[in-house]
Protein backbone atom coordinates (compact mmCIF):
# COMPACT_ATOMS: atom_id res chain seq x y z
CA UNK A 1 0.00 0.00 0.00
CA UNK A 2 2.83 2.39 0.86
CA UNK A 3 4.59 1.70 -2.44
CA UNK A 4 1.32 2.22 -4.31
CA UNK A 5 0.81 5.59 -2.63
CA UNK A 6 4.41 6.53 -3.42
CA UNK A 7 3.95 5.64 -7.09
CA UNK A 8 0.68 7.58 -7.22
CA UNK A 9 2.39 10.59 -5.66
CA UNK A 10 5.19 10.50 -8.22
CA UNK A 11 2.62 10.28 -11.01
CA UNK A 12 0.81 13.34 -9.67
CA UNK A 13 4.09 15.25 -9.32
CA UNK A 14 4.89 14.49 -12.96
CA UNK A 15 1.43 15.49 -14.14
CA UNK A 16 1.35 18.76 -12.20
CA UNK A 17 4.94 19.89 -12.73
CA UNK A 18 5.80 19.14 -16.36
CA UNK A 19 4.81 22.55 -17.85
CA UNK A 20 6.53 24.48 -15.05
CA UNK A 21 9.66 22.30 -15.20
CA UNK A 22 9.89 22.66 -18.98
CA UNK A 23 9.56 26.44 -18.73
CA UNK A 24 12.01 26.90 -15.85
CA UNK A 25 14.65 24.25 -16.58
CA UNK A 26 14.07 23.00 -20.12
CA UNK A 27 13.60 19.49 -18.71
CA UNK A 28 9.92 18.55 -18.30
CA UNK A 29 10.74 15.71 -15.89
CA UNK A 30 13.06 17.76 -13.66
CA UNK A 31 10.80 17.73 -10.60
CA UNK A 32 9.85 14.08 -11.16
CA UNK A 33 13.51 13.05 -11.27
CA UNK A 34 14.30 15.07 -8.16
CA UNK A 35 11.32 13.66 -6.25
CA UNK A 36 12.19 10.16 -7.43
CA UNK A 37 15.71 10.58 -6.02
CA UNK A 38 14.26 11.65 -2.67
CA UNK A 39 11.89 8.67 -2.74
CA UNK A 40 14.79 6.30 -3.41
CA UNK A 41 16.73 7.72 -0.46
CA UNK A 42 13.64 7.29 1.70
CA UNK A 43 13.20 3.67 0.62
CA UNK A 44 16.83 2.88 1.37
CA UNK A 45 16.51 4.49 4.80
CA UNK A 46 13.28 2.56 5.44
CA UNK A 47 14.99 -0.70 4.46
CA UNK A 48 17.77 0.01 6.96
CA UNK A 49 15.35 0.91 9.77
CA UNK A 50 13.27 -2.23 9.17
CA UNK A 51 16.34 -4.28 10.07
CA UNK A 52 16.44 -2.85 13.61
CA UNK A 53 14.67 -5.22 16.06
CA UNK A 54 11.63 -3.80 17.85
CA UNK A 55 13.25 -4.56 21.20
CA UNK A 56 15.94 -1.99 20.44
CA UNK A 57 13.35 0.66 19.68
CA UNK A 58 11.61 -0.21 22.94
CA UNK A 59 14.79 0.06 25.00
CA UNK A 60 15.76 3.27 23.26
CA UNK A 61 12.45 5.01 23.95
CA UNK A 62 13.71 7.24 26.81
CA UNK A 63 16.82 8.22 24.84
CA UNK A 64 14.72 9.10 21.80
CA UNK A 65 12.43 11.19 24.01
CA UNK A 66 15.40 13.18 25.30
CA UNK A 67 16.56 13.62 21.70
CA UNK A 68 13.11 14.92 20.74
CA UNK A 69 13.12 17.47 23.56
CA UNK A 70 16.69 18.47 22.74
CA UNK A 71 15.89 19.06 19.08
CA UNK A 72 12.85 21.18 19.90
CA UNK A 73 14.92 23.29 22.30
CA UNK A 74 17.86 23.67 19.91
CA UNK A 75 15.70 24.83 17.01
CA UNK A 76 14.49 27.75 19.15
CA UNK A 77 18.05 28.89 19.91
CA UNK A 78 19.05 32.13 18.12
CA UNK A 79 21.37 31.46 15.22
CA UNK A 80 20.54 27.75 15.08
CA UNK A 81 16.95 27.46 13.92
CA UNK A 82 15.97 28.88 10.54
CA UNK A 83 12.90 31.10 10.45
CA UNK A 84 10.52 30.47 7.56
CA UNK A 85 7.24 32.41 7.34
CA UNK A 86 7.50 33.44 10.98
CA UNK A 87 8.12 29.93 12.34
CA UNK A 88 11.36 28.48 13.75
CA UNK A 89 10.99 24.87 12.59
CA UNK A 90 14.10 24.10 10.59
CA UNK A 91 17.75 23.28 11.26
CA UNK A 92 20.22 23.46 8.40
CA UNK A 93 22.47 20.41 8.03
CA UNK A 94 24.79 20.95 5.10
CA UNK A 95 22.76 21.34 1.91
CA UNK A 96 19.48 20.18 3.49
CA UNK A 97 17.06 21.60 6.04
CA UNK A 98 15.52 19.30 8.65
CA UNK A 99 12.11 20.04 10.16
CA UNK A 100 12.82 18.90 13.70
CA UNK A 101 9.15 18.59 14.67
CA UNK A 102 8.83 15.60 12.32
CA UNK A 103 11.67 13.77 14.06
CA UNK A 104 10.35 14.84 17.46
CA UNK A 105 6.90 13.40 16.72
CA UNK A 106 8.39 10.07 15.63
CA UNK A 107 10.72 9.83 18.64
CA UNK A 108 7.97 10.81 21.09
CA UNK A 109 5.50 8.27 19.75
CA UNK A 110 8.14 5.53 19.96
CA UNK A 111 8.61 6.47 23.62
CA UNK A 112 4.84 6.50 24.24
CA UNK A 113 4.49 3.05 22.63
CA UNK A 114 7.34 1.75 24.78
CA UNK A 115 5.81 3.25 27.92
CA UNK A 116 2.35 1.83 27.23
CA UNK A 117 3.84 -1.61 26.65
CA UNK A 118 5.83 -1.50 29.90
CA UNK A 119 3.03 -0.07 32.04
CA UNK A 120 0.02 -1.66 30.38
CA UNK A 121 -1.02 -3.56 33.49
CA UNK A 122 -0.98 -0.40 35.62
CA UNK A 123 -3.14 1.42 33.07
CA UNK A 124 -5.75 -1.33 33.03
CA UNK A 125 -6.10 -2.01 36.76
CA UNK A 126 -9.36 -1.18 38.54
CA UNK A 127 -7.60 0.95 41.17
CA UNK A 128 -8.20 4.54 40.09
CA UNK A 129 -5.11 6.02 41.74
CA UNK A 130 -2.72 3.49 40.21
CA UNK A 131 -4.12 3.79 36.68
CA UNK A 132 -4.38 7.60 36.89
CA UNK A 133 -0.75 7.97 37.94
CA UNK A 134 0.35 5.61 35.17
CA UNK A 135 -1.58 7.70 32.65
CA UNK A 136 -0.38 11.03 34.05
CA UNK A 137 3.30 10.45 33.31
CA UNK A 138 3.06 10.23 29.49
CA UNK A 139 0.54 13.08 29.47
CA UNK A 140 3.06 15.34 31.23
CA UNK A 141 5.65 14.38 28.61
CA UNK A 142 3.20 15.20 25.82
CA UNK A 143 2.36 18.54 27.45
CA UNK A 144 6.04 19.51 27.52
CA UNK A 145 6.45 18.56 23.86
CA UNK A 146 3.27 20.46 22.95
CA UNK A 147 4.54 23.64 24.63
CA UNK A 148 7.85 23.43 22.75
CA UNK A 149 6.02 22.89 19.46
CA UNK A 150 3.73 25.84 20.12
CA UNK A 151 6.77 28.05 20.72
CA UNK A 152 7.93 27.46 17.12
CA UNK A 153 4.90 27.76 16.48
CA UNK A 154 3.67 24.48 14.93
CA UNK A 155 0.09 23.88 16.02
CA UNK A 156 -0.49 21.30 13.28
CA UNK A 157 2.21 19.04 14.73
CA UNK A 158 0.63 19.39 18.17
CA UNK A 159 -2.71 18.19 16.80
CA UNK A 160 -1.13 15.22 14.99
CA UNK A 161 0.97 14.26 18.02
CA UNK A 162 -1.90 14.46 20.50
CA UNK A 163 -4.41 12.68 18.25
CA UNK A 164 -2.01 9.81 17.58
CA UNK A 165 -1.01 9.51 21.24
CA UNK A 166 -4.66 9.47 22.35
CA UNK A 167 -5.37 6.70 19.86
CA UNK A 168 -2.47 4.69 21.26
CA UNK A 169 -3.68 5.23 24.83
CA UNK A 170 -7.17 4.05 23.87
CA UNK A 171 -5.80 0.92 22.18
CA UNK A 172 -3.70 0.22 25.28
CA UNK A 173 -6.95 -0.42 27.14
CA UNK A 174 -6.99 2.51 29.55
CA UNK A 175 -10.05 3.00 31.77
CA UNK A 176 -12.86 4.37 29.59
CA UNK A 177 -13.84 7.10 32.06
CA UNK A 178 -10.27 8.30 32.33
CA UNK A 179 -9.88 8.27 28.57
CA UNK A 180 -13.12 10.23 28.14
CA UNK A 181 -11.89 12.86 30.60
CA UNK A 182 -8.53 13.03 28.83
CA UNK A 183 -10.18 13.34 25.42
CA UNK A 184 -12.53 16.07 26.64
CA UNK A 185 -9.71 18.04 28.24
CA UNK A 186 -7.50 17.76 25.17
CA UNK A 187 -10.32 18.79 22.82
CA UNK A 188 -11.18 21.78 25.00
CA UNK A 189 -7.53 22.87 25.09
CA UNK A 190 -7.26 22.61 21.31
CA UNK A 191 -10.45 24.64 20.90
CA UNK A 192 -9.08 27.39 23.14
CA UNK A 193 -5.79 27.46 21.22
CA UNK A 194 -7.65 27.73 17.90
CA UNK A 195 -10.10 30.41 18.99
CA UNK A 196 -7.41 32.49 20.71
CA UNK A 197 -5.37 32.83 17.50
CA UNK A 198 -6.77 34.73 14.48
CA UNK A 199 -4.47 32.77 12.16
CA UNK A 200 -5.62 29.38 13.45
CA UNK A 201 -9.24 30.52 13.39
CA UNK A 202 -8.88 31.56 9.78
CA UNK A 203 -7.32 28.23 8.81
CA UNK A 204 -10.15 26.32 10.49
CA UNK A 205 -12.86 28.37 8.80
CA UNK A 206 -11.05 28.09 5.46
CA UNK A 207 -11.03 24.32 5.86
CA UNK A 208 -14.75 24.26 6.64
CA UNK A 209 -15.62 26.57 3.72
CA UNK A 210 -12.64 26.96 1.34
CA UNK A 211 -14.79 28.44 -1.44
CA UNK A 212 -15.50 31.54 0.64
CA UNK A 213 -11.97 32.78 -0.12
CA UNK A 214 -10.96 30.54 -3.01
CA UNK A 215 -8.02 32.75 -4.07
CA UNK A 216 -6.82 33.55 -0.56
CA UNK A 217 -6.78 31.40 2.56
CA UNK A 218 -8.71 28.58 0.86
CA UNK A 219 -6.59 28.50 -2.30
CA UNK A 220 -4.65 25.29 -1.63
CA UNK A 221 -7.69 23.29 -0.53
CA UNK A 222 -9.75 24.51 -3.49
CA UNK A 223 -6.97 23.57 -5.91
CA UNK A 224 -6.70 20.11 -4.35
CA UNK A 225 -10.45 19.62 -4.72
CA UNK A 226 -10.29 20.70 -8.36
CA UNK A 227 -7.34 18.37 -9.01
Predicted regions, residues:
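Signal for well-folded cores of large energy- and translation-related assemblies
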Residues: 12, 78, 171, 209-212
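Hydrophobic alpha-helical segments of polytopic membrane proteins
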Residues: 62-63, 67-69, 132-195, 207
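Hydrophobic, glycine- and aromatic-enriched re-entrant/interface helices and adjoining loop segments
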Residues: 81-90, 94-97, 178-227
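Membrane-helix boundary/helix-loop-helix interface segments in multi-pass membrane proteins
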Residues: 1-5, 11-153, 221
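A short hydrophobic/aromatic micro-motif that marks alpha-helical segments and, especially, helix-coil
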Residues: 24, 68, 114, 120, ...
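Short, surface-exposed helix-loop/turn micro-motifs enriched in polar/charged residues
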Residues: 83, 127, 158-159, 196
